[in-house]
Amino acid sequence: MGFAPLLVFSLFVFAGTTKGFICSFDSIYQLGDSFSDTGNLIRQPPDGPTFCSAHFPYGETFPGMPTGRCSDGRLIIDFIATALNLPLLNPYLQQNVSFRHGVNFAVGGATALDLSFLAARGVQVYDVHSPLSTQLKWFRTYLGSICSSPKECSNKLKNALFILGNIGNNDVNYAFPNRSIEEIRAYLPFITEAVANATREIIRLGGTRVIVPGMFPLGCLARNLYFFPDGDKDDLGCLSSLNDLSIYFNSLIQQALASLRIEFPQAVIIYADYYNAWGFLFRNGPALGFNSTTMLKCCCGIGGPYNYDPDRECASQGVPVCSNPTEYIQWDGTHFTQAAYRRVAEYIIPDIIKELKCSYSSIQHLTEGREALHINERE
């Protein structure tokens, strides 16, 4: 699978590498897909309210009702906001809410590539109208509402953190039908270019600190395991060929970010290693509190070895939900549980904080308070 071995993080070691620096973020701007969407998809006419994330049991763990998050509760972006002592981001399409501390532009089902690009190559995308280019348009519109000149905009964004993704897995999923792995692989450079161009635009508009997550292991998703029952499996039961796609895409993204760092030396551009973060989780799940018998099974779903049936999805009538989502990694076959997102956040946040040169004191609440992340539980 190519996952990194079990890693041990110590807050005491981490503190020593960052002492003397202060994190001064006053806002976060998130672009991406359903792994980051906090409520935009369900507010898009005409079909928004019909999407599953608008219905229970989505949101059952937090906040106790559906919010548009494709999970039982919080997402990685929520834990990042909490770690930086900022409020959870409101979705761009929600009315009468505050955007003082940032905006979430991510939309469930979004692609990195424009829909016209995909359509020209025979890739059909249904019910999705807000690819990455649309989210950038929203950001430009928002920016125009808070500043009127490049200098003023740069000043407004000087203490902002941008997170671009993860995004790109939908481009791959939509292209799967009737295409070989080799054909899908040929799409990845185009997806990489779209992400790189979006990063470039964010920096040109005034962003100076940008996180670009990589792709998670596609071969471990219950949905993909359902659709490729005869695929080659690794020792964890994940599809090796699909995970190889993720690895290849991540190598392309890292190369693109290296070039962007040369192009924009004034910016801090961080690669977030989602692949190994999720790999850590799948490989060490039982030690982290997850049930060893349900690692690849859905908490909310029905049927088959993975508790997943695309014709009877989570939130559909008669589809059950597990009573213990904290013991499951997978939520609905395509997305993950709050418990899983929390653990991935634990994995990536220390590296992000270190690269952003934040002080230990600025992340004390990672291990204190009611929303503690307990990074040191790996020890």
Curated annotation (Swiss-Prot):
Arranged from A to Z, the UniProt key words for this protein are:
Alkaloid metabolism, Glycoprotein, Hydrolase, Signal
Q: Which gene encodes it?
A: AAE1
Give the family per the record.
Belongs to the 'GDSL' lipolytic enzyme family.
Give the active-site positions. S34, D332, H335
Which protein, by its recorded name, is this? Acetylajmalan esterase 1
- Going by the UniProt annotation, this protein carries glycans at N96, N178, N197, N291
Q: Which reaction does it catalyse?
A: 17-O-acetylnorajmaline + H2O = norajmaline + acetate + H(+); 17-O-acetylajmaline + H2O = ajmaline + acetate + H(+)
Q: What does this protein do?
A: Acetylesterase involved in the biosynthesis of ajmaline-type monoterpenoid indole alkaloids (MIAs) natural products, important plant-derived pharmaceuticals used in the therapy of heart disorders. Deacetylates 17-O-acetylnorajmaline to produce norajmaline. May also catalyze the conversion of 17-O-acetylajmaline to ajmaline.
